[in-house]
Amino acid sequence: MIHVYNRKVETHHTNNFYIGRGSPLGNPYTHITDKKTKAIYQAKDRDDAIDKYSHYFDLMYGSNLAFTSAIDRIYELYKTGEDVYLECYCKPERCHGDVIKEKLESRLLKEKIQERMKKR
């Protein structure tokens, strides 16, 4: 299972991946206007920033080595049934970690369906 958690509130020591802006998986979009962030682009609000990250994910995966490697490391652990922890600062608010989680869950489901289709 993939868990997205707030690093200010929880700590996990195994299969933990930091996904904040200082990492290859960080969201380059921010809704925050009153303080400095490492974000490159301004979004209207939190939902806009996360929706844009979903598109960004699709653009980066396969075209950016650091991004793709990080996603693949997470996915390989998740695929084996290991619990994986995505560490951010947003939770319990909506977070780009939710996008990462959804994309990886969809990928695994697609692979399982394809495997079953091959066996028919």
PLM regions: where:
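Catalytic phosphate/metal-binding cores of nucleic-acid and nucleotide-processing enzymes, i.e., regions
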Residues: 1-120
